[in-house]
């Protein structure tokens, strides 16, 4: 990253960068002379005038000849079940969950909608929604972003494809609860190599005209964007590509989840009129946008989805998946209506009919999607939908472990601190690769503690030694040490967290850890990467730093052999730990997870000992509250579904789930109780 600073601020900037463990080097000076000069080894290798740079190169001219648009409507052949199965199996529609779960969707503790919603986490969202990031305060403002593009339409008519890409992206925002008034756009374009062919040049021209027409019709502008004209390899050309991204801001309370909520509700279609060019009439479309927003904000509509590539059929199927609900289409709804394009239209779940809307069917609880006597099971559709990319992006592996028992240990008494504190100090070390320090500090601050984020500098041996000395001094003043999550050293080979453990094994730091736990009655916690460090140090389950061996428990690679990011349900198996003092055994809490190495492994004998001593704190459970080995509920294949364990006295707590990522208004499309109150419990421990 290049940063321009005033000359008098350079030294201060370098100092600040060093404090963040970043290398900063002055590389250039801004001068009054209008020339760009670059030197290498004392020799000027570039010396260009500013006037030349401003010219943008030599002027060029080309003739562009857009071709006549071809019909692009979806052709529906065959029966209802046949078309639905083919739809679920289509690469453009099938599940991408195995890919999406490889990316951390909850970092920053601001995710309003998870990528997949419903209790099954299977209904994909149509817009990304995140709270605006604020470090030390809270907000109910959020940003929304959605995209639109159909390559099959753009191939037939780049003009229509670009126009409808804009409509699709904006409609997805409206379906998610946003208001149209403050929507803006940005575009990404990608076309074949153009050369001097007039027809080839006609494709980007037609697409840009379509996008421009959509902007003028809607009265909204595109800001920025990126384009490329290199989409040709030998005789292969990419289809004309203009992807529209729509973005806006709104309040969290207005955000609507997409999945169907309950059986018996009606589903209606509200759609705009289309003009002679087979595009939505602008006045009609804007009226539809206003009506949909009004229905969502009044609570009359419980869920909403705008049909895209797969039409109404795709929307209904995906809305059903989230909560395992079925659907029965109304008589008189043709297959062309069900499977055809419906850009700018909206499906809404309502309890009563809506004036001007077409009732297309009702939600059922029979696990089927049916139309006039022909039906197909939701399970069959889900199988086709998820199996298509299973060999590439795995998500449904089977477990060889039997379902474990639910452990239960009710604490009779708990450890107490040697010194009370109304506002305990929390030391949060930040190692290379740590990425949860802000979320952790905020959770601690909200609970009433005083967090200190301490960046470990490893840019040289001297910097590491200095960090060790300063960290040991900071530990003397702290009551809690909290090791946050992340990917220490990029999740180093042969196990993550090795640098963290090496740091804590330093004699000075090790001595302060012993003093904190043995003499001052302090607390420690590690989440995700921090839990991995606690395990490797022996702090869990043994309560002290030891030389671990093969008999010790460990955390290893997820059985699915990839990163997992989703919401899981965890059951309190023991409330012995001061961190869990506000919970009851049997309570179930939902929590985000994001890790590639979270599989807890230990011998049967050790697990029995931990259970008997109340050191198994939390377990992964299914929708019925039972400990499970099923990959849907136990994301890493942990033995006995163990998610978190403690030291013998409970004062050191390690867990995989990111409980620090809880805040009001998050994860609205995945039901559950997310407030485990572990940070409040830790603060109360010292009072």
Residue ranges and their predicted role:
Residues 438, 492-494, 534-537, 603, ...:
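Short glycine-/acidic-enriched loop or helix-start segments at secondary-structure transitions
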Residues 306, 528, 658:
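Active-site glycine-centered loops adjacent to acidic/histidine catalytic or metal-binding residues
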Residues 34-36, 230-232, 253, 532-536, ...:
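Short, well-ordered, mixed-charge alpha-helical segments that flank or form enzyme active sites
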Residues 466, 470-473, 514-515, 547-687:
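Amide-donor transfer/coupling interface in amidating biosynthetic enzymes
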